[in-house]
Swiss-Prot record:
Enzyme class, UniProt record, top EC level: oxidoreductase
A Pfam family matched in the record: Fer2_2
Originating organism: Homo sapiens
Protein name: Aldehyde oxidase
Stated role: Oxidase with broad substrate specificity, oxidizing aromatic azaheterocycles, such as N1-methylnicotinamide, N-methylphthalazinium and phthalazine, as well as aldehydes, such as benzaldehyde, retinal, pyridoxal, and vanillin. Plays a key role in the metabolism of xenobiotics and drugs containing aromatic azaheterocyclic substituents. Participates in the bioactivation of prodrugs such as famciclovir, catalyzing the oxidation step from 6-deoxypenciclovir to penciclovir, which is a potent antiviral agent. Is probably involved in the regulation of reactive oxygen species homeostasis.
Amino acid sequence: MDRASELLFYVNGRKVIEKNVDPETMLLPYLRKKLRLTGTKYGCGGGGCGACTVMISRYNPITKRIRHHPANACLIPICSLYGAAVTTVEGIGSTHTRIHPVQERIAKCHGTQCGFCTPGMVMSIYTLLRNHPEPTLDQLTDALGGNLCRCTGYRPIIDACKTFCKTSGCCQSKENGVCCLDQGINGLPEFEEGSKTSPKLFAEEEFLPLDPTQELIFPPELMIMAEKQSQRTRVFGSERMMWFSPVTLKELLEFKFKYPQAPVIMGNTSVGPEVKFKGVFHPVIISPDRIEELSVVNHAYNGLTLGAGLSLAQVKDILADVVQKLPEEKTQMYHALLKHLGTLAGSQIRNMASLGGHIISRHPDSDLNPILAVGNCTLNLLSKEGKRQIPLNEQFLSKCPNADLKPQEILVSVNIPYSRKWEFVSAFRQAQRQENALAIVNSGMRVFFGEGDGIIRELCISYGGVGPATICAKNSCQKLIGRHWNEQMLDIACRLILNEVSLLGSAPGGKVEFKRTLIISFLFKFYLEVSQILKKMDPVHYPSLADKYESALEDLHSKHHCSTLKYQNIGPKQHPEDPIGHPIMHLSGVKHATGEAIYCDDMPLVDQELFLTFVTSSRAHAKIVSIDLSEALSMPGVVDIMTAEHLSDVNSFCFFTEAEKFLATDKVFCVGQLVCAVLADSEVQAKRAAKRVKIVYQDLEPLILTIEESIQHNSSFKPERKLEYGNVDEAFKVVDQILEGEIHMGGQEHFYMETQSMLVVPKGEDQEMDVYVSTQFPKYIQDIVASTLKLPANKVMCHVRRVGGAFGGKVLKTGIIAAVTAFAANKHGRAVRCVLERGEDMLITGGRHPYLGKYKAGFMNDGRILALDMEHYSNAGASLDESLFVIEMGLLKMDNAYKFPNLRCRGWACRTNLPSNTAFRGFGFPQAALITESCITEVAAKCGLSPEKVRIINMYKEIDQTPYKQEINAKNLIQCWRECMAMSSYSLRKVAVEKFNAENYWKKKGLAMVPLKFPVGLGSRAAGQAAALVHIYLDGSVLVTHGGIEMGQGVHTKMIQVVSRELRMPMSNVHLRGTSTETVPNANISGGSVVADLNGLAVKDACQTLLKRLEPIISKNPKGTWKDWAQTAFDESINLSAVGYFRGYESDMNWEKGEGQPFEYFVYGAACSEVEIDCLTGDHKNIRTDIVMDVGCSINPAIDIGQIEGAFIQGMGLYTIEELNYSPQGILHTRGPDQYKIPAICDMPTELHIALLPPSQNSNTLYSSKGLGESGVFLGCSVFFAIHDAVSAARQERGLHGPLTLNSPLTPEKIRMACEDKFTKMIPRDEPGSYVPWNVPI
């Protein structure tokens, strides 16, 4: 055997040769650390977010074609890249050379905010264009299905990509065949004045053309290598692992005989996550990526044979081609497989994962195995002993020894038979999110009838997600043989299958009753599908489906999206070069798109740098009996392990009223609490050592996880907050009706794309320390680090260039991590880097507070609410953090848009044994307002009115007073409501929804509209201070720094717009480097929607100071340039630097009196959403959303609209699909994108229309603008209440007329189980207390 151990591949056109390759090295760290190509980002490490997307290209010497495909660099072992060409975002374009059209368009179409996900987005689209220069919208959405974005809401990204499509900008999906952009801007009414409608915020005609001839060519050397068919086996090894890549089938069998336990990997999408997340280790890996026999495609007389080495994407293309060429009766299996291949994972994973690997892995929630299991498929196996064929059946899927592969065998190919006439195959799945999400339950079903008699001859039904393996209901199917296909058979089948496919109440994954319901709901769908086909085949003998049932068979989800935007006109008196009010591109947009934007972990390694990782508690409430560090300390590369004992008297810091310990001392109070910190010379060694730290615990009582448990144990933080207005008790005596209710609202993970990251560098002189950190609050980082090191603050400088998303989650916990990291750096005199993995970040940092809201409302029969008594309980977690502030803001904002003449609201932050929850975009308002809106909805139901009528009758009117006695002018609130009513055609569509619901039993539509009043301010003048520093250099260029953090909201862009206006110079003349405590000290936190407000006023002040100094010089030489004026000023000894300062808004709140002026102004808005739900599965589709917002005078409509729609999508996720799951022991189950689902492109509204009200004056703010970062989150609940409306319609048709309270998030499980029917009544129910549930509702 001729062996080679040298690895050769190309990266961005440059040859890479590695002689000593570690098989455990993945491409992502290799690119970032070894090649310093940091454009490719770490987002999750498991192929679930797309941030690390690159293009892999290979030449096939047989077809003479080059195949380009997207791939997740975090899962690709570099050993698998021999002979491949890797292209990263740096390789397609750069600001130093030329940017690629993809990079240009995604930037100029405002498709970047924080920019962290952008390189992955760019590479997914770039790869698509390499294969399809003029893609369809279907191809476009498929290509982006594996990429997540937490900021933009996806609309601008889709708009950018549409410019490459065959019919650019067209929605391509309207029922009448007319694009939405050609329908008079979708028929949206124009406002009277001050605004204009545009489908885009960019000029398409200015874009660079896409020219395929200018792309990087595939390296000729690799083509020659491939043509030579080198017969050298590749062997790579390290101390821990060997990697074998055979070149022939015979050699593969020899390796498998020699190493029978070694996994055979193609794409590493199954083995890779097991190694990373489950700690599985394989000393030998076999990679047969060059063996032709594994990529066979054979069309035989009885079916199709597909090689086990084919990627799922290749299988999808092959099957799509087959179904085009063969009659439908032969391709039933292939249609079913295609249905699931379209939603299975993302494009990257589908291009990496192999068919054989997917089958052999036998994951219990596999989407393909249930279909293959019912289709009489067989597996062709091979070993040194010879060939063997086994059926792909339940015995194989459950790994029965006599039906499984032998250790020395490999899977060569799969036989998938053609279907026959009178044979029907279908596939079903339901997931938390429709694409790139593991199924909750999936199924494959096949039935074969006698010739035209409707009698079942064969029946096979398999399910995934309901057991440890794919389950086949063979006993039930056998009992149904010989029966007629009718409703009697269906009823018997449901009962048989529920009895056979049984689920324990404690089954992993939870959702047990939902899963039981899906089992028979899918069967009913199959029954309807087959019945419909039978009717078409033989109209005489088979009855038609009832018209009301036909919609049950229609697919909910559309891949086509259209949008219109309406933003403000620029006044005729404004100078043409004044950028204020123009849709200016995010000034880092191009750098985001080229990968040149530097984030914290992109900074180069410092000499002798160490890496720090944490060991966290595995118990929720326990005493630490002992910590054994000996084995971990003895490992190679480990420098130190620090515990609370090392930090001693600096192991805590008090920011609010309660100090929080950095590292646990004698007790732990939640799973995920920091216990000790491991310091090593590499990230790999630090993480390996952390796993060897042994901690012995002794559990303590009580274990408090839920709000109800905290109430029971009187466990809450002090003080209780209370807000009272009017006389509630007296008002209850005079109302017509009184109702009481409660609603639970789950928490939310920030899921910023860039995890917690920092690099602390000792300067080696005067004890100075530089802290580079991804944070919203540099001053706090400076203070906590200085306190920990017992240094004055002037020795510690904190630097933040940009943050890859934050949403409130990069403040207090970031400070604790930074303090420990700085302590380690100071102790050892070496730079220390700390970057949390996604799972660590989700476990440690907490998120949005879960809420329990209780309400008692007194109201008149016309819907007027005269008395409201509310109680808010938040699940604060184990420490105070910012929970009291969240409760306060929730109470102050709970009235939303409504005037309640008599109001009492109390709030408690509940202490529990969960990681501390913290600030999150909206800061208590999304929870508090949902409670209020739920009460409104229930009042409407009691009065027999629509919720919208009750909303408008209780809404603030013109000048009024809030419960805390602050004056409010609600004119723009009413205008937003009216404009949204008109823009959405609410009245007409409400009639259409009711008509649809009357005609359809299993699908229902809902329509809901909600108003928004969002107070903006931080509650005190001190919190609203801001400063800025502006320098003018002698060449006329300007450098501006300020205290705000750029975290995607475009604050730096707006600040440069301010400088441009105030100094009357082009924006290109102004530069902004980042934020540092060295240049702007004592800056407040960036949050609360006021970052641009406050810092903009400080920048404006600095500029006006400079302009006042320079006015005499400018007036003497009005035609001069800034270079002339700066030089003259210098010659005359005039200071060309100025500090700007803003004292903060006049704001205060007296909680003892329950009154004050805590806010500077109010943002108003309204949103209307229409949804369609599938009553059988709980699935939903957002058909259309219309949003109208009052933004004052927009500084930058592109950025402002981006904030509105990004917040809306994040809020939609909060209220619908984002679900945190904790075990009864307090362990977080949802620790990554595989388990926790944020909205993806498939969740976008099919139609999205956003309008800004005409300009309105607001004298105290920056150019009369308003901060919009947080307010739009709440508008996502328009989707929640539209679903509520649809569920109500379903329940009423089923005779369920009682009160309906739906908790948030309104997941598929809750939707389905609320749509009660004969199937939900049929399932068995477990008695509470008779089992230990998998998860506990928090």
